[in-house]
């Protein structure tokens, strides 16, 4: 699985200018996602962040490869949790048409924001838990606020819990949980086709909780609530 590395976002079944690029499966040679450039980076005592652009490229065109989608990732890591065995970062992605042609993401069982666990996490050395309390055998294609993957490396457990923002398309999003491979993805296209058009980019936000041991559901629920409805301050004139 050449395409399953770390954290990534790609779609499987798409329609673009009469072709069907598969941006997920790199080995088919018909499409790919590539880094395009760095737009911004900053850091301070509260958070550090960077912004990058990625191109979703159709390789099966009659002429030269053609960029179908421009995707901007804003990644922000928060200075919290280190003394309690966890860290926290957010990814906000904006996916826009690269030109006048729309892209239709077709109904599919997987494809979207994804995460792959360590090679050592195959089989019983990997566990899943969702916000609905589902484990690996029952979680696949259920709709969730968050999903956690954890595994054992040299006898030590650790994991990541990914939280979907309530403003995301089709929230609570379905989640694809693989029966044997240590990966999962949020897959809004499981509920049917959707379009990305020149005048309407797709904006998605996720929070990543990186933790020692297995996830504590109460802690994940609290952090999801903080993500979904952060505290707000208002200045009121007397």
Regions from the PLM with identified roles:
Residues 59, 98, 211-213:
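Short coil/turn motifs at secondary-structure junctions
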